[in-house]
Curated annotation (Swiss-Prot):
This is ATP synthase subunit a. One of its GO terms (molecular function) is proton-transporting ATP synthase activity, rotational mechanism. InterPro entries: ATP_synth_F0_asu, ATP_synth_F0_asu_AS, ATP_synth_F0_asu_bact/mt, F0_ATP_A_sf. Its main location: membrane. The keyword Ligase does not apply. Keywords: ATP synthesis, Cell membrane, CF(0), Hydrogen ion transport, Ion transport, Membrane, Transmembrane, Transmembrane helix, Transport. One of its GO terms (cellular component) is proton-transporting ATP synthase complex. It is a multi-pass membrane protein. It comes from Frankia alni (strain DSM 45986 / CECT 9034 / ACN14a). F-type ATPases have 2 components, CF(1) - the catalytic core - and CF(0) - the membrane proton channel. CF(1) has five subunits: alpha(3), beta(3), gamma(1), delta(1), epsilon(1). CF(0) has three main subunits: a(1), b(2) and c(9-12). The alpha and beta chains form an alternating ring which encloses part of the gamma chain. CF(1) is attached to CF(0) by a central stalk formed by the gamma and epsilon chains, while a peripheral stalk is formed by the delta and b chains. Key component of the proton channel; it plays a direct role in the translocation of protons across the membrane.
Amino acid sequence: MEVFVVPVLADEGFEGPTKEVFQTPHWFDVGIGSVNLYLNKATALTIFAALFVGVIFWLGFRRAKIIPRGIQNLCESAYDFVDLQIARGVIGEKGARYTPYLLVLFSFVLVSNVLAIIPAAQFPATSRIAVPMVLAVVTWVMFIYAGIKSNGAGAYFKEMIDPAPTAPLAIRLLLGPIEILSTLIVRPFTLAIRLFANMFAGHLLLLVFSLGADYLLPKPPFVFGVASLLVAIVLTAFELVIDALQAYIITILTAAYIGGAMAHGEHEVAPSEELAEHAPVGVPAAAHA
């Protein structure tokens, strides 16, 4: 579709956001053999988000003090949140080693998303599918690495191929391909699509109401223009919440995938052991059976 159009106003000359909003023009192109390198707004904002996150954490931790203030306080608060609520909260104590990656992932996605409502930028870098796909591939490599490191390559891939060795053969033949497909393809694919679709749709919705307000305000009755403007303002605030929520979701899903990969090979707890674990101190598990 060449142009996104609001049908109600199309006959009056109003056109919604065009595809150029997301397919930003190239600022310059450089050809190196068969490789064509270019820079556009989307690429520039992606680079800016990465540099911004790196500089903020460098400033926060380069001269760390016992009593944190300013940027150091912000960085330590972000680290504690990701470490306690996501890394250790989802994976467990062994998740602490993955806190740096989860922190960088959360911070980069958050900054990239928030660029959608920053004047002059007004474009979420994550609304281009390439960015979420790269993040998903890195996460895919990370949880495969975590599974191999925790269980060994042989045990990890063996359980992926045969996740239920005690089940009947027909079930095993069914579960094996499903587990392989889920781990190697579905997880990174859905991780990328979820982030891309939310940011694309949110930015598109903001543009429709913002352009609608710009089109309707000079035209009587002015109530429609004012209403469109108010909706655009409310959606901007709502978009900020969605930006933070999407950063949190992709980070916690990454932690869940890493934790699941590390848990491969662990057998279910026997009922008696589970009862003993949750029984009050001094009371035998058998008393609760």
